[in-house]
């Protein structure tokens, strides 16, 4: 697979396809005519937003303009792979947040993710996408991600599990 390194992408966003309860989550990076779409999990989008939010709070205050780019996914939505590990760092001299999205590499025999503490020298390394984001882009991502995560199925008031439009088997009401 091909890896990408973008030092100043136009857009870094998240989005979904499908109705609540059946949504598929994606991360997307756009730079000029290049569109990179990666499939991910809802929890990864939420965790990335939480981490970004904390990182922005921890940084020295710096004036930055809010991102004004369109944060909707650009079609066609064709993921190049599914994201596995995600790394985030702060580049102080350039005042950039560096995000590394690594491809989820599955073990060929069992279809399960390889254990990171048991490297296989014969295993093929997965691809990655490395982006350097401005504070404005990160702030825009946080707002977009929170909107997406909260727009899912409402939680059951008794057990907290998601409730489908047709209801759900609540273990606390059984």
Where does each model-flagged region fall?
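Intrinsic, low-complexity N-terminal interaction/targeting segments
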Residues: 1-26, 66-128
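Residues in flexible loops and secondary-structure boundaries
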Residues: 20-22, 35, 46, 96, ...
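The feature marks the first
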Residues: 1-58
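Short, structured motif recognition centered on aromatic/hydrophobic residues
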Residues: 23-28, 48, 52, 97-99, ...
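Mixed-charge, glycine-accented linear interaction segment located at domain edges/termini
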Residues: 106-167, 171
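Short, well-structured hydrophobic secondary-structure segments
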Residues: 35-89
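A generic structural micro-environment signature
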Residues: 12, 18-20, 44-46, 94, ...
